[in-house]
């Protein structure tokens, strides 16, 4: 087997590659998401339609492919210091030609250019029922760090019981933490790496949620639904 470099174009750190039955999608921390074109042997940008106001969504925190349909893909996007720290899920059902935008900022927030951005995909589709999708991020204290959809991403709601996985405050558009967490000092104040849901997987009717909570168990398992 021989390995070589593959051109992907300018756009930051490649933080994840997700494969379906055939299609391949890649995410970057500041340069959007890409789909591999087998005919041209190149990676093609999927989020080129974004304007300056929405540049924060070029920070792609996670990708999920519908296990039953490679053309149905979900991109979890957001950046702590651009686009008012909003978090959205872009959904395509035609392989990236068009996208629906679903804003989930009121429930979770993500920072696709933050530390730990390479630590897995924080969104997953149930292979037994692709209308069910789980998604995680950082949240306000006392809120659930895990949300889910039962209608293919049209609507989302918090999953009860996940309110201690991590939290987020956008007071300075960056996660800040209480004294129980390790804190570093920067010119703008104190901060810590993002804390909350880092990765999600669904298999055999179980949803596995990987977290990053200091001093606690970092994998939570529950029945889907």
Give, region by region, the residue ranges found by the protein language model.
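Extracellular glycan-interacting surfaces
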Residues: 1-225
């Amino acid at each position: 087997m021989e390995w070589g470099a593959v051109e992907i174009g300018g756009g930051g750190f490649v933080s994840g590659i997700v494969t379906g039955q055939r299609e391949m999608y890649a995410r970057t921390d500041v340069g959007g998401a890409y789909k591999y074109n087998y005919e041209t042997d190149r990676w093609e940008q999927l989020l080129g339609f974004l304007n300056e106001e929405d540049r924060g969504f070029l920070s792609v925190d996670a990708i999920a492919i519908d296990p039953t349909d490679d053309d149905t893909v979900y991109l979890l996007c957001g950046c702590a210091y651009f686009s008012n720290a909003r978090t959205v899920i872009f959904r395509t059902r035609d392989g990236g030609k068009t996208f629906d935008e679903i804003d989930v900022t009121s429930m979770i927030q993500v920072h696709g250019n933050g530390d730990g951005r390479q630590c897995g995909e924080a969104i997953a589709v149930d292979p037994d029922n692709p209308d069910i999708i789980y998604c995680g991020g950082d949240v306000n204290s006392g809120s659930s760090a895990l949300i889910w959809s039962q209608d293919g991403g049209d609507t989302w709601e918090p999953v009860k019981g996940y309110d201690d996985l991590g939290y987020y405050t956008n007071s300075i558009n960056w996660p800040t933490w209480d004294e129980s967490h390790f804190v570093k000092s920067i010119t703008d104040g104190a901060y810590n790496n993002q804390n909350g849901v880092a990765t999600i997987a669904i298999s055999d009717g179980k949803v596995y949620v990987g977290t990053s909570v200091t001093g606690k168990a970092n994998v939570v398992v529950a029945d889907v639904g």
